[in-house]
C-alpha cells in the first residue's frame, strides 16, 4: 500500500481480472497505469503494461462486490474484498472509441476508498467537461433512428458521467434554430444535436445568430467581424449524411461522438458566411458547390420519396446531363496559411497548420487595424472566368464513408481558409476519372481541367446574371484583370445552376463568401494520427 501527497504518485498492489498487478497513479502525468506483478513488491512495468490518461476516464465507481463472482480461486485469499471500477475510453479500429470498464480489487476498505477519493479529486479538476447540455433530437433524419440511438448509446454515458440534459425532440424544420434564438442558453455548457448534417446546420445557424444578436453584430454585413460563441456543439451522427462528424472525428459512430462530449474535447472550426447583395443567405462549414453538386441537391429535393436512394439517382442523372455553366470567380488567396491544397498533409488532432495559420491571421488583422488601408484592399485579388462543370469550396476535407479522403484531402478545419476547386469543361470520361479519384489514393487535382486555390474570400457571378449583378463584376475590374483560358465552346445552353450549401439549396448564383477563422467549437479533437487500439486487459 502506498501513501500519497498533493502531487505524489499513488502506488499499490491490487488485483485485476484475477491477476496480481502493480497499479500506479501519477498526478504529474495525469496517468493511471497497471502491470502484472506476480512476485513480491510492485516490480517494474513491462511491455504488457496498460495505461489510461485521467482525461479519458469517464467515471470511477465503488463496485458492488456481492454481485461479482468471488467464491473460488484467488479471491478466497481475501476475507472481505473491496473493489472500484474505472470507466474509461478504449480505442478501437478506424478511429472508433468504446466504453470500457476495468475493476480493481483491494484487500482493504481503506485502500479502496483512498483510490476512489484520489481519482475523483483528479476528475473534478477537469473543468472542460460539460455538466449541463441542451440536446436536440431529429426523429425523422436518416433512417429515423435518432431517438433510439440517443437512448441506447448516448444517454447511459451521459448518466454515468453525471451530465444532466434538457432534451427537445424536434417536430418541424428549423425548430432547433428558432429555439436557440428564444431560450436562455447561458445555463448550458454545450449544445448536442442528434441527426445528420442538416440538424447540425440548424444548431450552427441558431448558435451563431444568437451570439451575433447578443453582441450587436449585423450578420447581413459581408465584412462584419463575427463573435465566436462560448458554447461547444456536439454531433451524434444519425443522419443520411454525417460529413461534419466524419471529418472532425474520423468516423460516424454515435458512441465515439458521445465519448468525445463526455471527456470535454474541444475543436475550433472555420465557418464561411455566404451573402448576396448585402444579405446573409447561409453559413457553411463543409461544402459550397455550384454546378455538379448544386444540380444534384436541387434535383434530389424533388425525389425525397426515394429516401437515401435519391442522391444516387440524382447523381447519375446529373452526370449524364453533363451541364456546364459560364461565370466569373474572383478570390483573395489565403497568404496567411502555412499549407497548400496539394501538400498531402491532412488536418489531424493538434494540427500545426491550424495553430500557425490562426496566429498569422491574427497578426495580419493587427497590422490592418493600425494601418492606413484595410488588408483586403492591399492584397491582390485574382479572377478566373470560363465554363465550369463544378465550382466547389470546402472548409474541411468533406470525408465520408464513400470518399474516405474527401473532396479536398489536405483542407484544414481551423486555418481560416477554404479550398476553392474549379473543374473546367471537359469530357464525360475525364470528369468520371476525376470523380473516381475521390474514392482512392490518387491526386484528384492532377488534371489539366482542375484548378485548386486556398482562399479566404471569394465571389462568383454567373454569366447569365452579370447584368443583374454587375456591381460585383465592376468592383472586381477596378482591382484586377481577368485570367482566361481558351477552351472549346460549351454545347450546353447557358443557364444558371444552384449552390449546394451544406446540403441546402441556394437559388442565387451570385454570392460573396468570407471565411471566419475558428468561429465555432465542437466537442471533438480532430482525427487522431494512426491511433493504436487499446488493450485494457
Curated annotation (Swiss-Prot):
Positions annotated to bind substrate: 195-198
The keyword Transferase belongs to this UniProt entry's keyword annotation: yes
Active site location: 197
Localization annotation: Cytoplasm; Cell membrane
Modified residues (Phosphoserine): 340, 408
The keyword Calcium appears for this protein: yes
Documented effect of changing residue 10 to A: 99% decrease in catalytic activity but no effect on substrate affinity
DAGKc domain ranges (all copies): 128-278
EC number(s) recorded for this UniProt protein: 2.7.1.138
Cofactor(s) required, per the database record: Ca(2+); Mg(2+)
Tissue expression as described in the entry: High level expression in heart, brain, skeletal muscle, kidney and liver; moderate in peripheral blood leukocytes and thymus; very low in spleen, small intestine, placenta and lung.
Catalysis: reaction(s): an N-acylsphing-4-enine + ATP = an N-acylsphing-4-enine 1-phosphate + ADP + H(+); N-(hexanoyl)sphing-4-enine + ATP = N-hexanoylsphing-4-enine 1-phosphate + ADP + H(+); N-(acetyl)-sphing-4-enine + ATP = N-(acetyl)-sphing-4-enine-1-phosphate + ADP + H(+); N-hexadecanoylsphing-4-enine + ATP = N-(hexadecanoyl)-sphing-4-enine-1-phosphate + ADP + H(+)
pH dependence of activity: Optimum pH is 6.0-7.8.
Pfam families: CERK_C, DAGK_cat, PH_CERK
Reported impact of residue 10 to I: 71% decrease in catalytic activity but no effect on substrate affinity
Keywords: ATP-binding, Calcium, Cell membrane, Cytoplasm, Kinase, Lipid metabolism, Magnesium, Membrane, Nucleotide-binding, Phosphoprotein, Transferase
Positions contributing to ATP binding: 138-140, 170-174, 202, 239-241, 304, 310, 502-504
One term under GO cellular component: plasma membrane
Annotated membrane topology: Peripheral membrane protein
Domain of life from the UniProt record: Eukaryota
Regulation: Inhibited by sulfatide. Inhibited by sphinganine, sphingenine, and N,N-Dimethylsphingosine (DMS). Cardiolipin at 0.1 uM significantly increases activity, whereas at concentrations >1 uM has an inhibitory effect.
GO terms, molecular function: ATP binding; ceramide kinase activity; magnesium ion binding
Functional summary from the UniProt entry: Catalyzes specifically the phosphorylation of ceramide to form ceramide 1-phosphate. Acts efficiently on natural and analog ceramides (C6, C8, C16 ceramides, and C8-dihydroceramide), to a lesser extent on C2-ceramide and C6-dihydroceramide, but not on other lipids, such as various sphingosines. Shows a greater preference for D-erythro isomer of ceramides. Binds phosphoinositides.
Protein name: Ceramide kinase
Native species: Homo sapiens (Human)
Source species taxonomy: Eukaryota, Metazoa, Chordata, Craniata, Vertebrata
Amino acid at each position: 500500500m502506498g501513501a500519497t501527497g498533493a502531487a505524489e504518485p499513488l502506488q499499490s498492489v491490487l488485483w485485476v481480472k484475477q491477476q496480481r498487478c502493480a497499479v500506479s497513479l501519477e498526478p504529474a502525468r495525469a496517468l493511471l497505469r497497471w502491470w502484472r506483478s506476480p512476485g513480491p513488491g510492485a516490480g517494474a512495468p513491462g511491455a504488457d503494461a496498460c495505461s489510461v490518461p485521467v482525461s479519458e476516464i469517464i467515471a470511477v465507481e465503488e463496485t458492488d462486490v456481492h454481485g461479482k463472482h468471488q467464491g473460488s480461486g484467488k479471491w478466497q485469499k481475501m476475507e472481505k474484498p473491496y473493489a472500484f471500477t474505472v470507466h474509461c475510453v478504449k480505442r478501437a479500429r478506424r478511429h472508433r472509441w468504446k466504453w470500457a470498464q476495468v475493476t480493481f480489487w483491494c484487500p482493504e476498505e481503506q485502500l479502496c476508498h483512498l483510490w476512489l477519493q484520489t481519482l475523483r479529486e483528479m476528475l473534478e479538476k477537469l473543468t472542460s467537461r460539460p455538466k449541463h447540455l441542451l440536446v436536440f433530437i431529429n426523429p425523422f433524419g436518416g433512417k429515423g433512428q435518432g431517438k433510439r440511438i440517443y437512448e441506447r448509446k448516448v444517454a447511459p454515458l451521459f448518466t454515468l458521467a453525471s451530465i444532466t440534459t434538457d432534451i427537445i425532440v424536434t417536430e418541424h424544420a428549423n425548430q432547433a434554430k428558432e429555439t436557440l434564438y428564444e431560450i436562455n442558453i447561458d445555463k448550458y455548457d454545450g449544445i448536442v444535436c442528434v441527426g445528420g448534417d442538416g440538424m447540425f446546420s440548424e444548431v450552427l445557424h441558431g448558435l451563431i445568430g444568437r451570439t451575433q444578436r447578443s453582441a450587436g453584430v449585423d450578420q447581413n454585413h459581408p465584412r462584419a467581424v463575427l463573435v465566436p460563441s462560448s458554447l461547444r456543439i456536439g454531433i451524434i451522427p444519425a443522419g443520411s449524411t454525417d460529413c461534419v462528424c466524419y471529418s472532425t472525428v474520423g468516423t460516424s459512430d454515435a458512441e465515439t461522438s458521445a465519448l468525445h462530449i463526455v471527456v470535454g474535447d474541444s475543436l475550433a472550426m472555420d465557418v464561411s458566411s455566404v451573402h448576396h447583395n448585402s444579405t446573409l443567405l447561409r453559413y457553411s462549414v463543409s461544402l459550397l458547390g455550384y454546378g455538379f453538386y448544386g444540380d444534384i441537391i436541387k434535383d434530389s429535393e424533388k425525389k425525397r420519396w426515394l429516401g437515401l436512394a435519391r442522391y444516387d439517382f440524382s447523381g447519375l442523372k446529373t452526370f449524364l446531363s453533363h451541364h456546364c455553366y459560364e461565370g466569373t470567380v474572383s478570390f483573395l488567396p489565403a497568404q496567411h496559411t502555412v499549407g497548400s491544397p496539394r501538400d498531402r498533409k491532412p488536418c489531424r488532432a493538434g494540427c500545426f497548420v491550424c495553430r500557425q495559420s490562426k496566429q498569422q491571421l491574427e497578426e495580419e488583422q493587427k497590422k490592418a487595424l493600425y494601418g492606413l488601408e484595410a488588408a483586403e484592399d492591399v492584397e491582390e485579388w485574382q479572377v478566373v472566368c470560363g465554363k465550369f462543370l463544378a465550382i466547389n469550396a470546402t472548409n474541411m476535407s468533406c470525408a465520408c464513408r464513400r470518399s474516405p479522403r474527401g473532396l479536398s484531402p489536405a483542407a484544414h478545419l481551423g486555418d481560416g481558409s477554404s479550398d476553392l476547386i474549379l473543374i473546367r469543361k471537359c469530357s464525360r470520361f475525364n470528369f468520371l476519372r476525376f470523380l473516381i479519384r475521390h474514392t482512392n489514393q490518387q491526386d484528384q487535382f492532377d488534371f489539366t481541367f482542375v484548378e485548386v486555390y486556398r482562399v479566404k474570400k471569394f465571389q462568383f457571378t454567373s454569366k447569365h446574371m452579370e447584368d443583374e449583378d454587375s456591381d460585383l463584376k465592376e468592383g472586381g475590374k477596378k482591382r484586377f484583370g481577368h485570367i482566361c483560358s481558351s477552351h472549346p465552346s460549351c454545347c450546353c445552353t447557358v443557364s444558371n445552376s444552384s449552390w449546394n450549401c451544406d446540403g441546402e439549396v441556394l437559388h442565387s448564383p451570385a454570392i460573396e463568401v468570407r471565411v471566419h477563422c475558428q468561429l465555432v467549437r465542437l466537442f471533438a479533437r480532430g482525427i487522431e494520427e494512426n491511433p493504436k487500439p487499446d488493450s485494457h486487459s
